[in-house]
Amino acid sequence: MIIFRKSFFTFWLLLNSVLALVITQNRVDRGTLDLSVGDITINSGASWSIINNAISTLVGSLTVQPNAGLYITSTSPLLSLQVTLTSLLSTIQNNGIIAFNSSPSLTSSTYNLVGLSLVNTGEMYFSASGVLPSVMALTAASWSNSGLMAFYQNQRSSGVVSLGTPLGSITNNGQICLNNEVYQQTTSINGSGCFTANRDSTIYIANVLLPVSTSQNFYLADSQSSIIVQAILTPQVFNVYGFGNGNMVGVTLPLLGNILNPAYSYNPSTGILRLRNLLVYQDFNIGPGYNPSLFSIVTDNGAGLPSTILGSVSYSGPVPPRALPASCKIACKPVPTAPGTNPTEYTTTITTTNSAGKPLTETGVVDISTDSNGSWFSSTTIFPTSSSSSSSSSTVSSTAPSSSSTKPSSSSQPSSTPPPSSSSKASSTTPSSSSQSSSTTPSSSSKPSSTVPPTGSSQSSSTIPSSSTQPSSTAPSSLSSPSSSTTPSSSSQSSFSAQSSIGQTSSSTVSSSSSQPSSSQPSSSQSSSATTSSSSQFSSSAPPSSTQSSFTAESSNSQLSSTTPSSSTEASSTVPSSSSQLSSSVPLTNSVSLSSVSSSDNGSSSASSPSSSQSSIASTAESSSTFPSSSDQQSSSIQSPSSQESSVSSTPTSSLQSSTNTISSSQDSSSFSPTTSDNSSTNSASSLSTLSSSDTSVSNPSTSNVSSTDNTQSSVASATPTDSAISATSSDITTEFTTTWEVTNSDGSVSTESGIVSESGTSFTTITTFPPPTTSSDITTEFTTTWEVTNSDGSVSTESGIVSESGTSFTTITTFPPPTTSSDITTEFTTTWEVTNSDGSVSTESGIVSESGTSFTTITTFPPPTTSSDITTEFTTTWEVTNSDGSVSTESGIVSESGTSFTTITTFPPPTSSSVAADVTTEFTTTWEVTNSDGSVSTESGIVSESGTSFTTITTFELPVVCKRDDISCGPATSATNSDTAAQDPTSDATAIESEFTTTWTTTNSDGSVETNSGVVSQSGSSLTTITTFAPDATSEYTTSWTTTNSDGSVATNSGVVSQSGTSFTTITTFEPPVVCKRDDISCGPATSAMNSDTAAQQLTSGMTATETEFASTWVVTKSDGSVFTESGIVGQSGTSFTTLTTFAPTTSSGAVQTEYTSTWEVTNTDGSVSTKSGIIDQSGTYFTTLSTFAPTTISGAIETEFTSTWVATDTDGLVSTKSGIVSQSGTSIATLTIFPEPAGTVYPVTTLFTTEYVTTCPNGELSTATGVVVVSTDSKGIEQTVTSVVPSTVYTKETVTSIITHCIKNKCFESTTTLVSSVPCPTQVPGVFTSTDNGHGVPIASIDVTTGAATVSNTIKAQDSTGFTSAGNAITTAITATGAVTTSVGGQGSTDYSNAGNTIAAGSGSDSGSGSGSGSGSGSSSNTVGIVNPKVSSAASGITVAAASASAGQSWPYSSGGSGNGVLPSGANNVGSNQTPTVSGGNSNPSTVTGAAVGAGGVVSGSPSYSGNSLLISFVSSQSGAISSSTGVTIPIATENSGSKFSVGKSAFIAIILTTFIGFI
């Protein structure tokens, strides 16, 4: 077996070493992942981020080195985290960062790390949402923390934090932070660390028998934190910091004082706050400086705690100054952001084989982001390859749930290099080519560069290189420091690049110079030709919401090389060449383009472009191009043989002195306002002009003169949608056509996609990707449905979710979680959500959603706005409102939405009491199906009125108009609706649209009064028609309480029935205040009989005056149709008369359930006294309202009160337990009204005493054995503690005591009665040296009831030393071996013996004399032996001996005639029975002296013996009543058969010592 164990252990170690995983570089995994890889080690400098892996089971040890991290994260609200390490042989060693975070999740998470040991010197974070209770347990057997541990919840729940193995110990020398958490102590706590409770957290010391180090600190960091300590008889001192501002310190029992001590006390000199419950207390070292008058007793009823009524103390003042320990100064950091949880982009290279069988290498951008549910998906944009003539490009957009593992590449080649965060420096570059061998040298960069499109863009970017066929100088241009730019996911900018790198967020900057060539770029000297890289590629990608992009062109002319640093913080790029083709929505038809920009000292600059007649660039809503101006005089010219004159103005932006040059023409048309980024500013006037063009392609070279003004003027170009012109709107494309291309998927497969491509010159951009080919009737729809699923065990279950249907193909998009209970309430409400379109763009939709439990179903989707401007819509919704008193209520009404602005138009009145009996009419928006006359089914939406089970359609909404992209005549010919108004007159040349909305108006009645009405209004043009008028606010009545300021300035609280009509309140009835009586004031209170709390009304007793009372009740009502229903309300009773005051409205299924019940509470009166009141409470959800307060009733003069109490009860099976509940007291009569249920798994503490053996040496050398007391107790957790009492040896009196003994095991208790005897075993007092021997726990020996002082004993006894006394010259020796206990009236206190034991009366010596003839006389003192038997044993004694008298030879026993001094054999001694006196034969009873003839010469005895009258009476007691105890005073237990004997109790010293010793131990 030993060999097998060793082999198994060796095999286990070998298996873990083989399966070990070592993380050496940053790694990100998303989706399902199996962590059964053995030991996991994360090396320094590396991190492992696991995202949306629902179950993470660690099967081996976990080691995180310094500067390393392990992150397990959930970003989905529907996905929880289950992280476990359950191997008892595994360890956790953290020197870096461990972070488990599921705070976005709406479900419960579990972090359960067991293992052999846990050592933390770094930082550990555990976070959950708190919507449902979560498990956070770090229960390793060996547990040590010297770093930071932080536990977070978004809101507090009943879940607790558990640290260490229960009943074990933990060592904390670091910081443990709690946020909305409860830490429940289950171990002893060592070390000098700190527990910090913050944001409504509680530290709960649940077991003080497990000691807490006096150097451990507890810090209450905010006003809602608290600490609670178990209250038992073993107090400790707890160091508490930060006590004040309303936070709480408490114990687990109500705070009650006794005769000598108050419920709490504070010592200003020591800083100790003592909280007491009668005899038990706990001490808290809160420090000095507190004002005792600011303490108050409160109740800590936080979630996850045993709620103790009035068991805590709060301090209303600020925290006095006190230095915090070093461990409490360790900052409680927030949960760090895990790598990979933010959307990111990176470039990748894909090598495939084309149709010709040749390898094709493509480069693209991978965009990783999440949808609205937190699910990850990726989209890839492929860059097109370059071509010398015409080139085509494709933009591949693939969307799929991401479950990829991403690692950075160490290669310097263009490859897949995603970073660990949202930034990306690695990218790729498509170099340009030239047909001339002496052409320009392609520019180079220190890193591969590429264009990274902005995250979330609805359009992809493409790059088309151009080739230069013109000769140019060979001055190579290099870019030593590639510029980089990162577009965050929330922004929308365009990005233009020419062999540049985009990575971190920064603007592209190229230094500029004046007349001397001071550029950092190498340039050719004194060359009049343009210095270029052979060509420059540009890519543009702009989502519809883009606001700004910058474009920088750099001149490498020897005269001047300058660019103005760009101040834009948006995406920007650098063009390190002077030859370019621009694909910024500008048609450049010539594939050969060469432009040169020169700059001189006089500030003039010229650029020629033989490639296109369109040398001006339109500024669109998606992108704008920025040219630097290097002239000192801010003037430049661009030559182009065109008839148009364009002006360029420069507008400096922000403090970085970037000049934004925008080209505009002299034609005026419609204008638009440019948008700028948040960090740029325009300090000059701006004029708007329009650019139009009659031709976009000219075969002959043309020039255009462009002049630039100073920095005080700016013109922004806009385009009108004329023929072949450049448009400023995002939907006006230069050329669009449909094409097909191949896409390489992530799994390497090649698929064909089709879509709409935009062509601008030689630049192609994918606008739309079509879904897979379907028939003309295959329409993709999404709907909610239910289906059956066969589980792995063969069972069939039903699931529901959202399914996408395309033709005959169905795809499950979302599966709803099953309802948690059968009573889930279905509600409908209006909301807004995000949808990811097929092209990867994200749009926002609104509609009506049905919620049942945690399941959501989309009922109606509102049509999107038809124009680009904000459209005002109105819909019905529900929201929460915080009232002036801080309470939260729910309101419903009609809300107007304009863009992102919401305005409340109408607030619906709450349900009223008048609508109880009758059906309530409500109006709401819904969707239904209609079967048309041709049999087809269509869906309509509108406003429906519901009255009972009847529905009436009030308004039917117009169906949305769906237009194709190129159908410009589609849609209503209306102008845009102003987003700032609810309705607007249509333009004069447009057809008016009829719309319906809810509004409020005032009406003047015939009597001149003005009232306000609300309803649904139809608007057609400027004509308004009222369709529906809402009913006015109804009047409702309910019971409430309010405060009133009396004439003397005092504030009183009144209760009564209030009528509410709209926002108007009227008091109908004011309840009489309750009469407060003292307990003994029998004349106080109304002279009425007691009202039974279980009935709604009761007859008043005769002879009493009837008092009118009001209370809540429920009754049954029969309708006119014979149906029966139940109503509730407030009933007034006067004598035997009942009147219904108020009928409560019935509760609806969509709201909280309203209940009413009787309760008792405490009220602080104006004089500071606390009184108890009872009444009827109305509970709706978490809100409580006092409906009626009962007046104290009297029964024959006695006052009836109700209060909460705790008592001890013996159940029918003999079990003794402690119960709590509400007790009613009337005079001296007490009745139990309510018994609180006991918490599940309650274990009662047990205290049991056992005897132990002490041995002492008497002065005469004898050993005296006594029994001591061993106290064995168990706490509420069942943990046994054993303590042996110290027994003094100071008692030398003989007393007896009778005790009633109660012995409890768990919650079963037994009672018996016994008698104890104390006596002195040693004649003199000597110091005792004791040794104890535990009698064992097999049979309980003794215990003492703390309340009564009674002792419990059992039936085992040890031998006692004999005690010798002398009586009448005879020595009585008693046997010392016994199995039972006995006392006798003999002074010797002899103990009983076995049946063969006997007591001996020793014979004395004697002499004789006589004549020689054989006769004579003599005297002797020979003793007689009396046999003594156990009074409980009827058998005769044996072994009786008689010592022979000293006589002449020949004497023998038995004696013969003749001689004297012979011993006498007593008769009857062997048959002494109970209560019998032994007799001796020979004529005398019990002789002590024998005289007679002596033995003469020759040995003949002569003479007759005679007996003296000296006698010894020996009597025996048959009934035993106690036990013998030693001089130590410790009781020797008696036999079980003697239990029940009683006699008077003497207040002996030894009993006092026993009680003192036991209570001192407790």
UniProtKB/Swiss-Prot annotation:
Residues 338-353, 383-415, 422-729 have a biased composition (Low complexity). Keywords: Cell wall, Glycoprotein, GPI-anchor, Lipoprotein, Membrane, Secreted, Signal, Virulence. Induction: Expression is repressed by RIM101. Glycans are attached at N190, N373, N602, N679, N705. InterPro entries: Cell_wall_rpt, Hyphal-reg_cell_wall_N. Coiled coil: none annotated. Residues 1-20 form the signal peptide. This is Cell wall protein RBR3. The keyword NAD does not apply. Its main location: secreted. The GPI-anchor is attached to the protein in the endoplasmic reticulum and serves to target the protein to the cell surface. There, the glucosamine-inositol phospholipid moiety is cleaved off and the GPI-modified mannoprotein is covalently attached via its lipidless GPI glycan remnant to the 1,6-beta-glucan of the outer cell wall layer. It is a lipid-anchor; GPI-anchor. A lipid is attached at N1538 (GPI-anchor amidated asparagine). One of its GO terms (biological process) is fungal-type cell wall organization.
